[in-house]
Amino acid sequence: MFILLLCLFIGFALRYYHLDQKSLWMDEVHTYNDSRDGFGDQIKFYKENPTFLHPPLFFVLTHLFYPFSKPELDIRIIPLIAGTLSIPMIYLFARSFAPQISIPCMVALTFMAYHISLSQDGRSYAILMFFGMVSLYFFMQHLKTSKKKYLIVTALFYALLFYTSYSSIPFILFSQILWFYKLEDHQKTPSLSSFLIQIAFTLLFILPWIIFVVSSYKGQIIMDPTHKEDPGPLWSLLYGILHDWVPFAPLIIASSALLILFPVFAKQRRNSLVLLAVLLSPMVGLWLYCKWFNVTHFITSRYFITFVPLFLISLFLSLLSIEFRFERIKRYLHLRFLFLFLFIASNLVILPLYYRHQKQDNRGLIVYLKEHLRGGDKIFTETESYFPAILHYFGVYPQGRHHVAKSWKDSENKTVYSISFVFQNKNITLFSSKTCCSQYVNDGSRLWIVAGKWTAKRIKENSPSVLKGYFDGSFLNFTRFPVDASIYLFLLDPKSPGEKGIDMPIE
């Protein structure tokens, strides 16, 4: 009990530290906009937009802290609570598999930089993982006791997952493989009625929303046409997940070896294969789905956040199996605690860097622009995805749920997006397109260029614009953890060709 309370205290401290010090990044600004509506307005929005990619539960919960007097804190409270509660929850969940791994799993999650980052992120990932753990905890309780009441609770938390994010659907589907898991050698095979009860109650809880969405569908577009990303090769996806969950090469190699050796040394090989199937099936399945149906969207480890507890459990069960197989080694080396030490050390290397750096310093960018903008200035961004964050920190909020940009085709048949707004009696226009930048300064206007690192390198080499600012974004949890989402600000002023900028390398 002392270790549990200590981990809970340390885990909360690590997840609360600097919680409101980091600027909102672009996805968190979407959370801000999506959570301004109360329950009634949420239902109205989904009736008009039934194909919106995110169901409403997380936004309804976040709305409890509206009007968001301090957004950097308010929209991160739910993830903070869920991330902290996940620490005692993984203790209980891991104990369902083997009491010997409950403390190592709990300690590992306490210091896991990846989980800490998502517990400080105003998105639904932390609460998804918590709901997922609770659902499987009661699932395992049913397998242990055969009591049907646990299936109803499992179904309830499956439904909460579904109402929080549609990305939980693979988790709900593939976690059914756990029906083949045997906690004891003498355990009876679960009855078909148990499986049907769980499925029936899950459908009972989620069908109202499915019926609502289907009945509201009037031919609205399903996939966002602006997403053109390639999911990439399968090996890259699997490596990316390992890279995020177990940082640095020594830990990646050790974890990969443990997963491979798990069926070799496990006393119950069937159970090890079941756990590995639960882990790998959704990753391979989602990748195949994107390939077969030409879904153009990146796949990130965050989409599999609900599987992190099973991943940790599999690692420590593998270590436990090796210790049981080689009892002589156990007298001198406790492999579980050696691995736990490596896990904690690897994450403690990352944590100081994570706390020191920003996710994406949109707030700092706008503070600088507010001091230097003149009437008639234009702001160009390499992608329109920058628009919501820039407008948010200028205090320009959408009239509805989201900003609506004007769009047209330029002379090169490229789509141009623009939004105009007034700041301190100055008319400012935001632009974004695939071509830049002479067309925006032909009238003598100054052009501020907002770019990421790779575009900034090209601009610095090939453009007469000068670098005016750098705004840190070294530790964003996006396509990988961490990703460098730093922002570089350039100024192109046709009336001042001798404008001075800052001299810094872009690496």
List where the protein language model places each region.
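A conserved nucleotide-sugar
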Residues: 330
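Membrane-proximal helix-loop-helix interfaces that form the catalytic/acceptor-binding platform
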Residues: 7, 11-327, 339-506
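N-terminal membrane topogenic signal
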Residues: 1-4
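C-terminal beta-strand-loop-alpha-helix "lid" module of Rossmann-like NAD(P)-dependent dehydrogenases
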Residues: 334-335
